[in-house]
A protein has these predicted regions:
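Helix-coil boundary/capping segments in enzymes
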Residues: 1-325
Length: 325
């Protein structure tokens, strides 16, 4: 079974150097092993070797049997910076990603990062990433400094993504209400999934997929609670006029055309997502190399599916993420 891992993260060394320059709101220190610690409001990440050494990472993929990874940046993203520096960092990251792809394809493909705090600059950078760097789309965060992805300031970005058939992979970030999630790592364990669910539902009810039907949406972490809550969203559509204002079909009909990555390694949850969206819309994802991610767990969950599940179709196609790269 060919494996295309569409949910994983990489910090280009050039990006880490830029964070250390003193121009960023992000602070970089080091742990006892010398790994960079990336501090940003409300959280921090440990950048282990797999986060920042592409040769090391390629060796891991070869050992584990992953054919391709579609690499993306991760939190804190560039939108936490000033608009000008966000655009600088996004271009730097995307140039680094394009270089990795040019040198190491088909082992690696990539999605662009965007300076989402500046919607106009995001349009410009997505166009550059797709036309000049030949990246198939971008990863976007589930909110932008508290602003919903459904906000109309982002619609010019969606207009371009629709015109080009771009991939937009929604990845969670610090959610609204994060002040209630300061203990027990509740923000990534619970808050991330809540924010993904909220972003997807808000986009649908706002009419974004109705207006821009050619965007190829991907939701991380099996869509948060979307497969579980879709029936409730449909009942809202039937019960409340406001929920019908911008869309002509039930929310689930839009959401079933989206893609969902498998960064939830529970077999029953994976089967629910497959039942909801179809096997061809559920994509392999590991969240490597985060502490909570796992390539072996990703592989075990896929191989543990019932034999009737068309896993070869599901996890070898990698949707247009790779074929467009």
């Amino acid at each position: 079974m060919k494996i295309v891992d569409v949910h994983n993260h990489f910090y280009p060394p050039e990006y880490l150097d830029a964070l250390r320059s003193g121009k960023s709101v992000v602070r970089v220190t080091a742990d006892a092993k010398g790994n960079p610690l990336i501090h940003y409001p409300g959280d921090y990440n440990v950048a282990v070797a797999g986060h920042r050494d592409i040769a090391y990472r390629q060796g891991v993929l070869e050992k584990e049997g992953v054919d391709t990874q579609v690499i993306t940046l991760t939190t804190p993203g560039t939108h936490v910076e000033t608009a000008k520096y966000a655009a600088t960092l996004a271009s730097l990251v995307n140039d680094a990603f394009a270089k990795i792809v040019s040198e190491r394809a088909p082992r690696f493909a990539a999605l662009a990062t965007l300076p989402l705090s500046d919607p106009a600059a995001s349009v410009k950078e997505l166009r550059r990433a797709m036309e000049e760097l030949r990246l198939p789309g971008a990863m976007v965060f589930s909110n932008v400094n508290g602003i919903a992805l459904a906000d109309q300031r982002f619609w010019p970005l969606y207009e371009l993504a629709d015109a080009t058939g771009a991939v937009l992979h929604i990845h969670p970030t610090s959610p609204v209400g994060v002040e209630a999630m300061t203990e027990y790592w509740l923000m990534p364990l619970v808050g991330f999934l809540m924010d993904t669910t909220l972003a997807a539902a808000h986009l649908v009810f706002s009419g974004v997929p109705e207006r821009f039907p050619r965007i190829k949406w991907v939701l991380g972490h099996l869509g948060g609670a979307i497969p579980y809550l879709a029936e409730r969203l449909d009942r809202g559509y039937e019960a409340f006029a406001e929920c019908r204002k911008n869309i002509r079909r039930k929310p689930s009909e839009y959401l079933k055309t989206w893609h969902y990555d498998t960064v939830n390694f529970d077999r029953k949850a994976l089967e629910l997502a497959i039942e909801f969206a179809g096997a061809d819309r559920v994509l392999a994802g590991s969240d490597y190399p985060h502490l909570i991610g796992s390539i072996p767990s990703m592989l075990a969950s896929l191989r543990g599916l019932p034999s009737r599940t068309p896993t070869k179709q599901t996890f070898s196609a990698g949707m247009p993420l790779v074929s467009m790269a």
